[in-house]
Amino acid sequence: MPQLNTAVWPTTITPMLLTLFLITQLKMLNSNYHLPPSPKPMKMKNYNKPWEPKWTKICSLHSLPPQS
């Protein structure tokens, strides 16, 4: 049974890998990637909150030092 000659394998595999790498790079160079989405400006709505003045009033009274 004849032996398999493996001496030429590195000279065959190395150019093949280089060619595959170059083809992949060229394909990636020609492909279009989407840009990251830009942030959409948010419009803040002011809702009528009846508890807000009361709550801030209570908090501000507690945070004040005691009056003498």
Swiss-Prot record:
Domain of life: Eukaryota
Transmembrane segments: 8-24
UniProt keyword Ion transport, yes or no: yes
Residue positions, PTM N6-succinyllysine: K54
Membrane topology reported for the UniProt record: Single-pass membrane protein
Compartments reported by the entry: Mitochondrion membrane
Pfam families, per database record: ATP-synt_8
GO terms for MF: proton-transporting ATP synthase activity, rotational mechanism
GO BP field: proton motive force-driven mitochondrial ATP synthesis
Modified residues (N6-acetyllysine): K54, K57
Keyword Mitochondrion set for record: yes
Keyword entries, A-Z: Acetylation, ATP synthesis, CF(0), Hydrogen ion transport, Ion transport, Membrane, Mitochondrion, Transmembrane, Transmembrane helix, Transport
InterPro entries: ATP8_mammal (IPR039017), ATP8_metazoa (IPR001421)
One GO CC term, this protein: proton-transporting ATP synthase complex
Coiled-coil features, chain-numbered ranges: none
Quaternary organization: Component of the ATP synthase complex composed at least of ATP5F1A/subunit alpha, ATP5F1B/subunit beta, ATP5MC1/subunit c (homooctomer), MT-ATP6/subunit a, MT-ATP8/subunit 8, ATP5ME/subunit e, ATP5MF/subunit f, ATP5MG/subunit g, ATP5MK/subunit k, ATP5MJ/subunit j, ATP5F1C/subunit gamma, ATP5F1D/subunit delta, ATP5F1E/subunit epsilon, ATP5PF/subunit F6, ATP5PB/subunit b, ATP5PD/subunit d, ATP5PO/subunit OSCP.
Protein role: Subunit 8, of the mitochondrial membrane ATP synthase complex (F(1)F(0) ATP synthase or Complex V) that produces ATP from ADP in the presence of a proton gradient across the membrane which is generated by electron transport complexes of the respiratory chain. ATP synthase complex consist of a soluble F(1) head domain - the catalytic core - and a membrane F(1) domain - the membrane proton channel. These two domains are linked by a central stalk rotating inside the F(1) region and a stationary peripheral stalk.
UniProt family annotation: Belongs to the ATPase protein 8 family.
Protein name: ATP synthase F(0) complex subunit 8
